[in-house]
């Protein structure tokens, strides 16, 4: 049984599209990058599943980011995903707290969900919705109802065991081209949403995807597309870090090297550290750094 895959399907008679995503290795890679407490682990799993689901709705090459921001215990959490299902993410919270609240609404004070879509060609689009619902899934449903007036159902669940972590998600939405697209009370959609709500955790986390879809929708006319593989992939590199340093005055960089012994840059997503010494600084500002560092660390 394969996790780290997204399955897309279509209800031909109801003009509704659906998605099922299950994450394991890709999710665990994010958790391994930092010592996140259980509450944050669960949050990142739900956010990662949601990002994968929404990434699959893109009609172009590009990426999408789901970011939660607030003045509460969780400052922000973000997952970035590309059109080909490469995901990465990070969260920041008040680490001075001895214990974080487990209730979603208590994690975010004056919180907002920001969804940013960035095509490789074209203008970036950004939408937002308040984090004023009991769950992240309901906040995402609210986003689609407000911004696109599309009936949408989202299910997000996580599982933590001694053998590792898993995150799953399901997504139903009336097709934008459907005549019922703006009818949030469409009976066909409501019927499918109620069927989807019957999914049990043990089914989501243990059954093959084909069995899940059959159990839920065996009486429906459904077309299933080939699955898409999902991986954790950070876009950081030594060269990109060097490009950022090129915008800083050379003298300032040399002062840091003289004081600290080296310039240290850490990726906020994978927490990989890149170090630059005096020779690197001279190469960066001479425009020869890429040539000098073909054997990247």
Curated annotation (Swiss-Prot):
Major localization listed first in the record, in broad terms: cytoplasm
GO biological process terms, semicolon-separated: protein refolding
Subcellular locations according to the entry: Cytoplasm
Organism of provenance: Pseudoalteromonas atlantica (strain T6c / ATCC BAA-1087)
Entry's family note: Belongs to the HSP33 family.
Disulfide cross-links: 234-236, 267-270
GO molecular function: protein folding chaperone; unfolded protein binding
The keyword Disulfide bond appears for this protein: yes
UniProt-listed PANTHER family: 33 KDA CHAPERONIN (PTHR30111:SF1)
UniProt xrefs under Pfam families: HSP33
Entry protein name: 33 kDa chaperonin
């Amino acid at each position: 049984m394969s996790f780290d895959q997204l399955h897309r399907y279509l209800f031909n008679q109801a003009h509704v599209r659906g998605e099922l995503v299950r994450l394991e290795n890709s999710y665990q890679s994010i958790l391994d990058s930092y010592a996140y407490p259980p509450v944050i682990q669960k949050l990142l799993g739900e956010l990662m599943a949601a990002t994968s689901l929404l990434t699959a709705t893109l009609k172009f090459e590009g990426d999408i980011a789901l970011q939660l921001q607030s003045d509460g215990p969780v400052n922000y959490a973000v997952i970035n995903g590309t059109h080909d299902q490469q995901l990465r993410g990070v969260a920041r919270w008040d680490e001075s707290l001895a214990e974080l609240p487990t209730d979603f609404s208590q994690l975010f004070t004056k919180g907002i969900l920001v969804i940013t879509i960035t095509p490789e060609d074209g203008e970036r689009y950004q939408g937002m919705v308040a984090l004023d619902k009991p769950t992240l899934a309901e906040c995402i449903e609210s986003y689609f109802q407000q911004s696109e007036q599309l009936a949408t159902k989202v299910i997000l669940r996580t599982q933590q065991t001694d053998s590792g972590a898993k995150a799953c998600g399901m997504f139903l939405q009336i097709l934008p081209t459907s005549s019922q697209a703006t009818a949030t009370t469409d009976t066909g959609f409501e019927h499918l949403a109620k069927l989807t709500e019957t999914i049990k955790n043990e089914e989501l986390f243990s059954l093959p995807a084909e069995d899940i879809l059959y159990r839920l929708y065996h009486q429906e006319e459904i077309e299933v597309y080939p699955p898409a593989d999902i991986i954790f992939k950070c876009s950081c590199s030594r060269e990109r870090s060097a490009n950022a340093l090129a915008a800083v005055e050379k003298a300032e960089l040399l002062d840091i090297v003289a004081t600290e012994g080296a310039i240290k840059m850490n990726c906020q997503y994978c927490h990989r550290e890149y170090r630059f010494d005096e020779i690197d600084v001279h190469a960066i500002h001479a425009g020869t750094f890429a040539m000098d560092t073909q054997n990247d660390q």
